[in-house]
Amino acid sequence: MKRKHGTAQAQAKPLLRDDLFHVIDQMGESLRDRRDRALLLMGFAGGFRRSELVGLIVADIETVRQGLVFTLRASKTDQERAGRKIGIPYGRTRFCPVTALEAWLNAASIKEGPLFRPITRHGNVTQEALTGEAVSALLRGRVQ
């Protein structure tokens, strides 16, 4: 019956700009805060899916005068894996995604490999990429 008539999928409530800014304002300057700030602002500014965010590597970034250009090598909407480019401009406020990403990469000394990585309970940044599930948990924890 469900297949014949269809049912709406349960979706999470969207995170609106003002809500995001409120979450960002609660963050400090710890390594974890810097990572989460960069992740949330980049995801929002670029309209990235979780899987796209965790799949980004340093080599995917091109710095241009107006900000950054990311090359997405594959995504849910790019089944042929042709890739696409997404531009992220500099912002004019403390919510600038480019500045937040640069602060995270510098603080974590990331020069290559995955952009967004787990941080151990001892404050060490690992070499692996965050998982999509970790991004969901991070967001849930920050929004609550």
Show the residue positions of the predicted features.
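Conserved catalytic core of the tyrosine transesterase superfamily
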Residues: 1-144
